[in-house]
């Protein structure tokens, strides 16, 4: 159970309340505006991912989302986790053990991202940085809490990675590969593969 929720934490601490620190540079302002528009217009995505934890553990899989609300994160063997969302519930399943845990999506930070509840006008908890053509948005609740980073290639602008940094500065990176955007996705892939009566 701990392993399931550790993985869930890494992949669903996706968006915190926003605050950005931005210089007066027109280039920075233009890039920040471009990132806001990118996230605003992000609807469907399909990609492979490689997840690397602080201890070097590597997991692989596929991720799909159809905003607002729908998500599928499917780990490949030897990991047997499947995470889906229908916009109301986040379902975490161990396919090998046939275990299912349902969590209200609104109780997870992922709700802000999946339901596109962005509030870039609240300037309290986001940092914006450009370095070597990489744009990084860092989201945090306070300086001592966990942080979540989104990394983008700046030219062309494209989401390439997110990083979770816990309160002990342990990092888990999720790198996206073979990204396809604005693809047509069947609603069936966002339905859990099986059900049982166990839920949180």
Please describe what each predicted stretch is.
Residues 63-111, 172:
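An acidic-aromatic
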Residues 53-55, 96-98, 168:
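Solvent-exposed strand-loop boundary residues in beta-sheet-rich modules
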Residues 121-199:
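Gly/Pro-enriched, hydrophobic low-complexity segments
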Residues 9-17:
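Bacterial N-terminal signal peptides
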Residues 49, 71-75, 90-93, 137, ...:
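Short hydrophobic/aromatic-rich beta-strand segments that constitute the beta-sheet cores
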Residues 1-9:
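Bacterial N-terminal signal peptides that target proteins for export
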Residues 22-26:
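Boundary at the C-terminal end of the N-terminal hydrophobic targeting segment
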Residues 37-56:
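A short, Trp-centered hydrophobic/proline-enriched beta-strand micro-motif
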């Amino acid at each position: 159970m701990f392993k399931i929720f550790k993985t869930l934490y890494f992949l669903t601490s996706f968006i915190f309340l926003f605050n950005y620190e931005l210089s007066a540079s027109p280039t920075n302002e233009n890039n920040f505006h471009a990132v806001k528009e990118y996230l605003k217009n992000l609807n469907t995505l399909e990609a492979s991912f490689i997840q690397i934890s602080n201890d070097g553990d590597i997991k692989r899989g596929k991720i799909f989302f159809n905003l607002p609300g729908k998500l599928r994160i499917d780990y490949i063997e030897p990991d047997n986790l499947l995470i889906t969302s229908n916009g109301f519930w986040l379902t975490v399943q161990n396919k090998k053990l046939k275990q299912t845990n349902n969590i209200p999506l609104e109780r997870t930070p992922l709700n802000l991202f999946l339901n596109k509840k962005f509030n870039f006008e609240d300037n309290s908890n986001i940092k914006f940085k450009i370095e070597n053509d990489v744009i990084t948005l860092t989201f945090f609740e306070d300086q001592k809490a966990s942080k979540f980073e989104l990394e983008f290639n700046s030219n062309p602008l494209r989401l390439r990675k997110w990083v979770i940094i816990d309160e002990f500065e342990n990092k888990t990176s999720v790198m996206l590969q073979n990204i396809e955007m604005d693809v047509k996705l069947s609603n069936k892939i966002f339905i859990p593969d099986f059900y049982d009566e166990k839920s949180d």
